[in-house]
Amino acid sequence: MAKSSLGQDSDSTAAVAVLKRAVELDAESRYQQALVCYQEGIDMLLQVLKGTKESSKRSTLRTKISGYMDRAENIKKYLDQEKEDGKYHKQIKIEENATGFSYESLFREYLQETVTEVWIEDPYIRQTHQLYNFLRFCEMLIKKPCKVRTIHLLTSGDEGFGNTQQSSGLEEIKQSLRSHGVVLEINYSSSIHDREIRFNNGWMIKIGRGLDYFKKPQGRFSLGYCDLDLRPCHETTVDIFHNKHTKKI
């Protein structure tokens, strides 16, 4: 059953808004975000086309859709080539006290089914809350559609009493992952400074603060204690690259 004229006008207005945003992002060379908006806007215009009866309007819509599809295809080819050449770079700036940046929100678009191996370099997987951060990251990998089988962790060793806590905590995580068919390889370095995460599908994510970018929750029963999307963050920068040939630690 065709939509009413009012419904079509509403859909058309929404499509125009999304495509206007796509053009703005395109002009700013923010191609990855522009592509998403183009694709969403095109889908919306196709729905409008289905409900349009007047031939002249249908012809106009087809012309617009064709133009947007051509531009989206060109952007996709450009991004694919950037990935092929190892030149792709996207930056996300997390503001002080920003929310909505759980590990799942940040990493989900890069964890395709082809991911089977992950490398993590982070010097600060030592204190209790940092061990929990790493555990949450591992939980995300287990839940995602990817079939992760090996996780490599390179971190720095804690000193004194903290060393026992660190080693026992990581060993417990290792045993837990093993029960899910995942091998955790742990290595220590006293000279490690960089923080980066790599997936064997070519994606590499560098976070200024590593996995430790969440603020301490206000209390054990406050929002954000369990759901990291609700947890305020420290200010940091996330740089995302793509390289077909990811190096191993």
UniProtKB/Swiss-Prot annotation:
Gene3D superfamilies, alphabetized: MITD, C-terminal phospholipase D-like domain, Phosphotransferase system, lactose/cellobiose-type IIA subunit
Principal location: membrane
GO process terms (BP): midbody abscission; mitotic cytokinesis
Top-level taxon: Eukaryota
Compartment(s) of residence: Late endosome membrane; Midbody; Membrane
Pfam families in the record: MIT, MIT_C
Stretches for region Important for association with membranes: 168-231
Keywords: Cell cycle, Cell division, Endosome, Membrane, Transport
MF annotations from Gene Ontology: identical protein binding; phosphatidylinositol binding; protein domain specific binding
Bilayer topology annotation: Peripheral membrane protein
Boundaries of every MIT domain copy: 8-86
An annotated GO cellular component: late endosome membrane
Oligomeric and partner information: Homodimer. Interacts (via MIT domain) with CHMP1A, CHMP1B, CHMP2A and IST1.
Free-text comment on this protein's domains from its UniProt entry: The C-terminal domain interacts with lipid membranes containing acidic phosphoinositides and is required for location at the midbody. The MIT domain interacts with the MIT-interacting motifs of several components of the ESCRT-III complex.
Functional description taken from the UniProt entry: Required for efficient abscission at the end of cytokinesis, together with components of the ESCRT complexes. Seems not to be involved in endosomal transport.
Name of the protein: MIT domain-containing protein 1
UniProt organism field: Rattus norvegicus (Rat)
Lineage: Eukaryota, Metazoa, Chordata, Craniata, Vertebrata
